[in-house]
Amino acid sequence: MKHRLLSFILLLSILFAIPNFAAAQSAPGLLLPIGAGYTDTYGAMGQYAVANARGDVVHILILATPYSTNSDRISEGERAQNLKDAEERRIQTDGACQRSLPEGSTLTCKVELLPIFTQEDARDPANLAYFTDDVSMIFILGGDQETGIGAIINTPVEERINELHANGMIIAGTSAGAAMTSKVMIADLSTGYGVDDGLFAGAVEIWNSPDKRGLEFGIQNAVVDQHFFQRARIGRLLNAIAQPNIPNVGVGVDAYTGIVSNNEVLSDVFGLYAVAVLDAETYHAADNVKYVSIDPNRPPIMSFRNVVYHLLAPGDVTYNLNTRTSSLANPAPTLDRSFETLTIPAGAGPLILSGDLIDNLEDSAVLNEFKTIAGENIFIVATGYPSGRSAETAIKKYTDALGMQVKSVFVEDQPIEIPEGTSAVLVIGKNQEKVKTEALAALKDFWLAGNPVMADNAAMPVFGSFYAPHEPTPDDSEREELATQKSFWQGRTDIAPGLGWVDVTLEPQIIADKRFGRLTSLAYNHPELLALGINKDTAILFNGDGAKVIGDNGIFVFDLRTAALQLGTNEGFTIANAMLDVFVPGEMMLPELADVSTPVSMQATPVFPTAMPTPVPTLAASTFVTFTETAAPPTPAATEAVTEEAAPKFPVWVIFVGLAAVIGFVLLRKRK
């Protein structure tokens, strides 16, 4: 009888332990990519770490591998300096943790700096002792993502990080650390490419192989980029998500800003600014990307249609990477757009609107186009310059590049008078804040009479319906932040009426001067109008045939006419389902049907000698792939901001039930 009772108690104890054991099985931890910086995101990071405490201690590890210059070796001097620099971040993180503790809480903070900078460090068994089961969060610092992941990839340390994350540990990463939070990782721009070259084939080095990648458990359905608007990285992210065998969605996290990724659902933007989502999958923008050769000495440039553009600010809007849907609104199954405003009145002369030519006037394709239509008597109008001398210097540069004698005037407050016999007018400017819009009004009759007009740089935006009268982006960091990032807050960009020759809004130097915030502000406040961002050395030529891109780079068209709009808790712009197109030189600016079930016409992907770890497959130029209705992505149903469940795992409790049954049976047999 006694043995039967013991058997029964043992069986009951195991069965009662099953629910507790199952509850102890944690979901994977959150991912917190932070675009750059520390101070403005420490508060939220500390709160997440405290909420994830595994006991009485909030245990945080600081991983500073991105500080290394080489993931295979390090000098003692560099190690000492790295430890010293990272210790400052450890102290700051500890302070954030302390401030996040609830009042009266018995929790304590334990923040440790990992002495791991190389592969050798990550294979040292002694360093595994830091990775205890109670770790709440690992915080990966900024620096170089190549060495950041390179120091731990395929090592016992990475394996242990994988285990801890699978059991609920949070991974936060800033700057390079954020880049590591997507499995497919942008390593850098390729050698010889600058930020202005992001749209050119071969510009981006992408790591997507077993030995070169981001964290294995990182975001699977998107590629993360950081410093996004601060460094105008939209071109390189578009480039990355258009590559074969790469997720066709990009997440661009701005500096001093973070976001939560929970099982591929993005939510709870924290910090100061915005997070962009570029969806090149829903309407097959990545599959239909075109590679256009504009210069035999340069790689082809990439042309995009129907990228879905989302913007998230702090607030309640979420984005599901699995379904590619925003909680604010779903994308339409089809979208048939018209760009009827990209036309000029019948009988008007050609109009060229360019994004800044002054640094490359010699052999400028845009200026050469103007020369072919301008005739012999060009009149240069300078406006928006700080002084007459500054205007004269600029006029001379354009005059020399034109290679002919011209008449010119520096406009202050008086309306211009066009000299008799003028065949074309070139309007140039430096500072949109100082452009004298009213003084240019007399130009319209001249243009409507069939005469060519060109406007460059700061003079160009005033020819749209509205423009942003601001100075160029300043060099000092505080004012630069105000111009490039705070412009994503409502009311931080001044907007004034333009001349209205073309019923759009315009912004020059869109990448070179980091003006996406200004363009977004124009688009958000006038969503009925197309918003055009024009790169340096690039222009739109309007004539009787329509609008055509000329020059050396791309033009961004933001279309918010069917987008859903909302302001975040910081008055930041929140946008769902805007449309983004990139037109390149030689192309007419005409939209294409956006259809989730449209056939895909894939162009050959140019292959260049790059540092990519594995060659990417390409299709022959003549290949045409047709997707049937069943193969096309379904129209997303309306979704709530829910957390996706993890893939089902083998129920471990079944083993315990079986074991209990066996033990009970054996004991009963022995009793008999």
Regions found by a protein language model. Name each.
Residues 25-56, 62-75, 81-82, 185-187, ...:
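C-terminal and late-domain segments of enzyme folds
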Residues 108-126, 401-417:
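A short, well-structured beta->alpha microelement
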Residues 654-672:
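C-terminal membrane-anchoring or membrane-association module
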